[in-house]
C-alpha cells in the first residue's frame, strides 16, 4: 500500500510540474532608452522597433520581472516603479506607478511573442527615457 501511495504521489507531482511548465509567462522588462548605440544582449528586437519609431539608439535592461498568464500581479522594479498586470477579456490591463504616483493606466493586447512597448518616463540621464516591454513567453 505504501508503494502504491508513493507512486500515486509521484505521478501527481509530475502532473503538477508538467502543468506549471506549460503555463505561459508574461515577461515585463524595464528598459532605459538613450541616444547612444549600446544595446543589452536579448533586447535587439526591441531596439530595432525603438530605432524605427523613436529618436533613440541605446536600449539597456534596467530590471526584469514576470508573472504567470493569465496575469494578476503587481511587480516591483528598480527606481520605485510598480507595474500591475491583470488579464481582462483577452487583453492585459497595465497600471504603472512610480513611488505610488500613477503614471499610466492602459490595456494592451499581446500577440504571440511580439513585444509591446509602453511608457516614455523620465530616465534620469539627459534625454533618457524609461519604457516597459511586455511580452508573452512560452
PLM feature spans:
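Outer membrane pore-forming secretion/assembly proteins and partners of Gram-negative envelopes
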Residues: 21-138
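Bacterial N-terminal signal peptides
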Residues: 9-16
Amino acid at each position: 500500500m505504501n508503494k502504491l501511495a508513493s507512486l500515486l504521489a509521484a505521478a501527481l507531482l509530475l502532473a503538477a510540474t508538467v502543468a506549471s511548465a506549460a503555463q505561459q509567462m508574461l515577461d515585463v522588462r524595464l528598459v532605459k532608452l538613450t541616444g547612444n548605440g549600446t544595446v543589452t544582449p536579448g533586447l535587439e528586437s526591441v531596439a530595432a522597433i525603438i530605432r524605427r519609431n523613436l529618436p533613440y539608439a541605446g536600449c539597456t535592461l534596467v530590471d526584469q520581472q514576470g508573472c504567470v498568464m493569465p496575469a494578476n500581479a503587481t511587480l516591483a522594479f528598480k527606481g520605485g516603479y510598480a507595474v500591475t498586470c491583470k488579464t481582462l477579456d483577452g487583453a492585459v490591463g497595465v497600471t504603472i506607478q512610480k513611488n505610488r504616483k500613477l503614471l499610466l493606466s492602459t490595456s494592451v493586447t499581446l500577440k504571440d511573442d511580439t513585444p509591446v512597448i509602453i511608457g516614455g518616463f523620465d530616465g534620469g540621464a539627459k534625454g533618457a527615457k524609461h519604457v516597459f516591454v511586455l511580452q508573452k513567453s512560452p
